[in-house]
Amino acid sequence: MTTDTIVAQATAPGRGGVGIIRVSGPLAAHVAQTVTGRTLRPRYAEYLPFTDEDGQQLDQGIALFFPNPHSFTGEDVLELQGHGGPVVMDMLIRRILQIKGVRPARPGEFSERAFLNDKMDLTQAEAIADLIDASSEQAAKSALQSLQGEFSKRIHTLVESLIHLRIYVEAAIDFPEEEIDFLADGKVSADLQTIIDNLAAVRREANQGAIMREGMKVVIAGRPNAGKSSLLNALSGKESAIVTDIAGTTRDVLREHIHIDGMPLHIIDTAGLRDASDAVEKIGIERAWEEIRQADRVLFMVDGTTTEATDPQDIWPDFVDKLPENIGITVIRNKADQTGEPLGICHVNQPTLIRLSAKTGQGVDALRQHLKECMGFSGNQEGGFMARRRHLDALERAAEHLAIGQQQLEGYMAGEILAEELRIAQQHLNEITGEFSSDDLLGRIFSSFCIGK
C-alpha cells in the first residue's frame, strides 16, 4: 500500500457535461471532508457543494467514496463528479492540491496502483489503455476480453502446465534410484508436446490480437506494371503514388496508413520485382524484399492480361520460393476491366484469389473485406484478446526455450537442462501478466497511459 495520495482528472480534458476528479490514497476521506464539509458514507452518491479554503462554492455535484480494499486501486478512492468545464476542473484540482500530502498523479498511476495492489494483472491494466484507444468495434471487444481476464487465463493455464511438468521432471532428477525412468516413460515427452502445441495456439491468437491493436502490415508486390501503385491509390483513396505505363516508375517504398471500418492497416507499395541493371532500381528492389520479409500479408499483384494462371507457383515460382513460410499471401489478378473476368474473391484454392481492377476500383471492396477478415474482423464474433509487441516477444522466447528443452530430452535425456529450460519459459510467461517484471518495464508500460487512469 502506498503512503501518498494522488489526484487527477479522470475524464478527457475539454468541455463536457460532466467532469470527474479522482483521488486515491490514505488522505482520500480527508480530502472529501475538506472539499465537501461532510464525512461521506461509503458507496453512497451524495449531491454536495464543493468549496474552496474560504468556504466559497466552486461547484456542486456528486461525491462518491470507496474505502480500501474495495475500490479500483485497492486504496481509499474519492470521486468528485462536477460540471465538465476545464476552468471548473482546474479550480477543483488546485483546491485539492492545497491539502498537505496530496500530489498530482503521474500518467497511468491509478492503474499502476491497481496492479501493485493485486486488483488486476498487467495484461488487464494494459487492456484499459487499449479499450480507450480502440479504433473499431472489434478492437474494443478484444480489449474488453483482455480486461475481463481472457488473455491472463490462457497464460495462467500454460504456467500451471509448466509447473506440473517441472515438478515431475525435477522429481525424476532428485530420485534417480527409482526403478522407473520417469524421463523415458513417455509422459514427460507427451506433456511437453501438449504444452508446446497449446503455446502455439496462444501465439496465433496473440498475433491476431496484436494486428488488431497495432495494424496489419500489407505489402503490395509483383512485377513492374502489374498495377501495384494503382492499387495503393485505390485503397488509400488518394493519389499517393505516380502511375504511368512506363515499367519501373516506382523505385522506392511508398507507405500509407489507412483504416478500414476503424481497423488499422499499413499499406506499402514496392518497386516492381525483376532483374534490373539500373543501380537505383536495384536498390528499390532490395528495399522491396526487406519490406516483404517483414510483412503480415503480401498482396501478389498479377497483370491479368499477361497470364491466365491463378496459382503463384505457376505464375512466378521463384518469387514464392523466396517468401518466408509464415507470411500470408493473397493473389490479386488485376485489370479485370480488360480481361472480362468475374470480379470478387475466390476461396476455392489456396492462397485466396481476388479479381479486380485497380484502375476503375471494381472489386476493391472485396479486397477491403478480405483484409478486414485477415485482421480478425467478424461481425458475429465477440473478439479474441488484445495483445502487444512485448507479449509476442515473451511468447516467442518461451517457445524457443521449450523447443530447446524438447531437443535435450529427445536427444540426450538431459533432465537437468530440460528443467532449466522449463523454468526460463515459465519466467517469460510470467512477464506477460506481471508476476515477474522489472520496475523499468512497469514504468514504461504505465507511463503510456492517460493521466487519471
UniProtKB/Swiss-Prot annotation:
The keyword GTP-binding is annotated on this UniProt entry: yes
Cofactor comment: Binds 1 potassium ion per subunit.
Gene Ontology, cellular component aspect: cytoplasm; cytosol
The UniProt record lists the keyword Acetylation: no
Annotated K(+) binding sites: 225, 244, 246, 249
Residues binding (6S)-5-formyl-5,6,7,8-tetrahydrofolate: 22, 79, 119, 453
GO biological process, any: tRNA methylation
Binding site for Mg(2+): 229, 250
GO MF: GTP binding; GTPase activity; metal ion binding
Cofactor(s), names only, from the UniProt record: K(+)
Chain positions recorded as GTP binding sites: 225-230, 244-250, 269-272, 334-337
Keywords: Cytoplasm, GTP-binding, Hydrolase, Magnesium, Metal-binding, Nucleotide-binding, Potassium, tRNA processing
The enzyme's E.C. designation: 3.6.-.-
PANTHER family associated with the record: TRNA MODIFICATION GTPASE GTPBP3, TRNA MODIFICATION GTPASE GTPBP3, MITOCHONDRIAL
Cited function: Exhibits a very high intrinsic GTPase hydrolysis rate. Involved in the addition of a carboxymethylaminomethyl (cmnm) group at the wobble position (U34) of certain tRNAs, forming tRNA-cmnm(5)s(2)U34.
Family of the protein in this entry: Belongs to the TRAFAC class TrmE-Era-EngA-EngB-Septin-like GTPase superfamily. TrmE GTPase family.
Protein name per Swiss-Prot or TrEMBL: tRNA modification GTPase MnmE
Source species of the chain: Vibrio cholerae serotype O1 (strain ATCC 39315 / El Tor Inaba N16961)
